[in-house]
């Protein structure tokens, strides 16, 4: 059984409860008649669902540094093969999540699926690492790319000061947090616009590339599978780069409870998004190779800029703006989705209860959104973020593979469970095996980094027993926790979701 939030013996519930009109009694607001229930609304349509998936998948990587795959494959042909295979494998994972999302109709993504199938301990470990390290570090990394590229047009002749990048990055992070705190609808609308910008940027690269092919610029595709020798032990790293570029297909499942008609919308949004992204990624890489050879691509710090300078002339100045908008879209979509993960984990008693509360008027999970802000700022101004993400990249695929393996378990354990969308069993089997295979080979290829990541992940086990299992916490601690919760409720104007009261 999942341990539910502890109900205080000191005060009634330990937190302030909103009245039927969604008002905190301590705020002294006059109650307007017929106000909506305080709960998250189903505002994610098919278009918004597609924009969430595409908007979070396509970040800066495809524009800045798709060379990670090429470095670890050794040839143009093998790199394009890896891009295609990673797209197909990501589609398999996404289809598996489509079945999980339409069978277990709860928000939270892999946290929820692991919780339902394998119990609270592995689910807690997943959200523990996500909250404290992975999500703040990942948000800081993509935000730094935003900061760098939004400033690039103003520093054409000189190096951009590192402090300026971090300051504008901090502003961008704050804007995203405020946007997601204030309105679900506006956040979704802006995500649609930013997704359109991403696809426009990709088309700006693909169309000239196709024209180059028509003109016969195919010299870089001759002997496509010959090139630098690359050990088979480096292929997992190529897959990591490829799969990382496709990461984001699972984010719609984080907001299942806010999706309109999820039984139809989730599978359809996933299929549309993955088809667009896979075709777009492969064609973008093909376009690069029509103008840039393998050696030049490996030396370039911003492949899209190099490509556009050669083919688009002065229009290449617009490329950094498109890259910055692409990064901003990934920031926005990631915060929108992951805040629901923290919201659900809090609702299940695995995070502080304030994180499962909703703003009485905006109907947004305000605390679950803003908790990321200080953590991301700490990551932004400290440490080597890339190394930290490398340490923990295996954990993402380990838990995603575990969640998809849970689908197979449910097929045999609960064969009569209602499944509006069902995939052939070989799809989740192949995907979960691939995830575990990548984790095993990463341990073989880079045991030091993977070992550090494994140790960091395991810190969630003692944390689980300390914060979740241990019920007999000191009275002073419980009193202090409740005072903090009530104070934050008043400041933030949040209450528990009405159906949970």
From Swiss-Prot:
Gene Ontology biological-process annotations: adult behavior; amino acid transmembrane transport; cellular response to oxidative stress; dipeptide import across plasma membrane; glutathione metabolic process; glutathione transmembrane transport; intracellular glutamate homeostasis; L-cystine transport
Consequence recorded when altering residue 198 to A: Loss of L-cystine transport activity. Does not affect location at the celle membrane. Does not affect expression level
Effect after changing residue 327 to T: Does not affect L-glutamate transport activity. Does not affect location at cell membrane. Does not affect expression level
Segments crossing the lipid bilayer: 44-64, 75-95, 131-150, 164-179, 194-210, 235-255, 266-286, 318-338, 365-385, 388-408, 423-443, 450-470
Modifications made to the protein after synthesis: Ubiquitinated by TRIM26; leading to proteasomal degradation.
Pfam families: AA_permease_2
Localization annotation: Cell membrane; Cell projection, Microvillus membrane
InterPro entries: AA/rel_permease1, AminoAcid_Transporter, L_AA_transporter
Protein's UniProt keywords contain Disulfide bond: yes
Intramembrane segments: 102-116
Topology with respect to the bilayer: Multi-pass membrane protein
Positions that bind L-glutamate: 135, 244
Consequence of changing residue 158 to S: Does not affect L-cystine transport activity. Does not affect affinity for L-cystine. Does not affect affinity for L-cystine. Significantly increases L-glutamate affinity
Substitution effect: residue 336 to A: Decreases L-cystine transport activity about 50%. Increases sensitivity to erastin-induced ferroptosis. Significantly decreases the L-cystine transport activity
Result for mutant: residue 271 to S: Does not affect L-cystine transport activity. Does not affect affinity for L-cystine. Significantly increases L-glutamate affinity
A GO-annotated cellular component: apical part of cell
Impact after mutating residue 197 to S: Does not affect L-cystine transport activity. Does not affect affinity for L-cystine. Significantly increases L-glutamate affinity
Residues linked to a glycan: 314
Record topological domains on the Extracellular side: 65-74, 151-163, 211-234, 287-317, 386-387, 444-449
Function according to Swiss-Prot or TrEMBL: Heterodimer with SLC3A2, that functions as an antiporter by mediating the exchange of extracellular anionic L-cystine and intracellular L-glutamate across the cellular plasma membrane. Provides L-cystine for the maintenance of the redox balance between extracellular L-cystine and L-cysteine and for the maintenance of the intracellular levels of glutathione that is essential for cells protection from oxidative stress.
PANTHER family: AMINO ACID TRANSPORTER (PTHR11785), CYSTINE_GLUTAMATE TRANSPORTER (PTHR11785:SF323)
Family: Belongs to the amino acid-polyamine-organocation (APC) superfamily. L-type amino acid transporter (LAT) (TC 2.A.3.8) family.
Oligomeric form and interacting partners: Disulfide-linked heterodimer with the amino acid transport protein SLC3A2/4F2hc; this interaction mediates cell membrane localization.
The protein's name in its UniProt record: Cystine/glutamate transporter
Protein's organism: Homo sapiens (Human)
